Amino acid sequence: YPHGSAQPQKVRDGSVILMDCGCAVHGYESDISRSWVFGEPSPKQRKVWNTVKRGQEIALETAKIDVPVGSIDDAVRKYYEKEGWGPGYRLPGLSHRTGHGIGLDGHEPPYLVHGDATPLQAGMCFSDEPGLYIPGEFGIRLEDCWFMTASGPKLFTPLAKSLENPI
């Protein structure tokens, strides 16, 4: 957790599939993750997926010009803790930052992580990936890239619609 297993896995009914990939165009990187269930999702899988989706939305709602980028991570963690996850970076919960800068490198500063005081400015690009991970069970991560404008964040890709339609 949070980036899969080093051992081969057999996909079975109820298995969570977590895809994390990206591409490079003219030297600029991208990063995207989607999670879905092979077969019928359990109520717990559905609840976690919906919680992560809301976490992604909270990150975007918090993104405003001059706001410290670390406050985006703080807002997502506050919501997750209210939902019973964590606290902080503890598992089960969100063990990594909410997102990272993206551009000429796939992971670059500034980071959407507690304590990063970098003020959010127009033109900055980030990933938004507030996953939730339950060791020994499953993890859900939804990740999309966005850029900051004077009027707020704008997505490069549409957010996942639902657990049944994550693309």
Give short role names for the model-derived ranges.
Residues 1-167:
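Active-site neighborhoods and metal-handling regions in enzymes and metal-associated proteins
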